[in-house]
Amino acid sequence: MKRNLKAIPVLVAGLFTSQLSIAAGSVSADPHAGHDMSAMQMPADENFTEMTSMEPIVTESRTPIPPVTDADRKAAFGNLQGHAIHDSAINYLVLLDQLEWQRSDNTNNFSWSVNSWIGGDTDRIWLKSEGERSNGETEAAEAQLLWGHAVGPWWDLVAGVRQDFRPASARTWAAVGFQGLALYNFESEITGFVSNGGKAALRLGGEYDVLLTNRLILQPSYEVNFYSQDDESRGRGRGLTDTELGLRLRYEIRREFAPYIGVSWNQLYGKTSDMAKREGEKDHQVVFLAGARIWF
């Protein structure tokens, strides 16, 4: 019995070795051995000859294409009128930029500033007006009629006349200048004036819209005026006469209608300041504002 138990491991090892030999032989053997594959052979030479005898693909036109002439271009793109290309459309805008109540030194004033135009993209007619009323009387009023011509994508050359109605007697000025958008969409204008009496003046102005939200807009603005000669009747001295810095916060209920509140700082300089003091007036003011901006 002990002799038989010792022989069991030897038998197991022999069986395992024989199984490995059989498996190795089956892998190395041809899997298609014994099968006749002669009937499945393809006539490779004949097919290759047929494929190489095909005509090459034509990549160029056999008929030469004639060069394009001016007559061809004219026939392809007809002569469009201004209406067809929307190039000569006449548009207009009326902007009541400032219609406001002002409060300073226990005085209530009403002020206005209007800019309107009609024309196309290149040439426009501008009508501007601004003024101020206090205690039921018009203290200052002027109007400008200008022709504007675009001299670039962002700037217009303007020329025309300005008429002063108040203060003092009426006065007519010739006007020429530039207006447009400076860097970062800063609306700017510079205009020179020459009166029928030989006096000259220069006005600089600008404003910028800061969008706090899509409808809440903060607008800083400035205006600076210079005169070439003293003008006692209008209370203006030679040189830098006055500056105005404004800050208005408006809310666009609709794009065409926006009420606002704000404040402005007005300062007189030089002889203009001296003239105001002789009349018992201050040469500086802080003015609180409330009004509306309307356009159509």
UniProtKB/Swiss-Prot annotation:
Domain of life of the native organism: Bacteria
Signal sequence coordinates: 1-23
GO CC terms, sorted: cell outer membrane
Bilayer topology: Peripheral membrane protein
Pfam families membership: CopB
GO MF, one annotated term: copper ion binding
Family matches, as InterPro entries: Cu-R_B_prcur
An individual GO BP term: intracellular copper ion homeostasis
Residue spans crossing the bilayer: none
Coiled coil: none
Major localisation: membrane
Keyword Glycoprotein: no
Keywords: Cell outer membrane, Copper, Membrane, Plasmid, Signal
Localization of this protein: Cell outer membrane
Record function comment: Required for the copper-inducible expression of copper resistance.
Protein name (Swiss-Prot/TrEMBL): Copper resistance protein B
Taxonomic source organism: Escherichia coli
Gene transcribed to yield this protein: pcoB
